[in-house]
């Protein structure tokens, strides 16, 4: 699975962006929980979730700065 693209995040509206950030944070929590209990087989999924979260938060911050 390739890493997500920033263009995909920029297409989301503000509410979808906020919902996606919450969903990725939950996914990251679940992945870390699985890693801690030794049940995580695809460890690269943590990297993908962190990358996606950073990407979404960057887009959110860019929109905040544009609104000022």
Swiss-Prot record:
One biological process term in Gene Ontology: translation
Keywords: Ribonucleoprotein, Ribosomal protein
Keyword hit for Ribonucleoprotein: yes
Origin species: Picosynechococcus sp. (strain ATCC 27264 / PCC 7002 / PR-6) (Agmenellum quadruplicatum)
Pfam family name, one: Ribosomal_L29
A GO cellular component annotation in the UniProt record: cytosolic large ribosomal subunit
Single GO molecular function: structural constituent of ribosome
Name of the protein described by the UniProt record: Large ribosomal subunit protein uL29
Keyword Heme (UniProt): no
Family: Belongs to the universal ribosomal protein uL29 family.
PANTHER family recorded: 60S RIBOSOMAL PROTEIN L35/50S RIBOSOMAL PROTEIN L29 (PTHR10916), LARGE RIBOSOMAL SUBUNIT PROTEIN UL29C (PTHR10916:SF0)
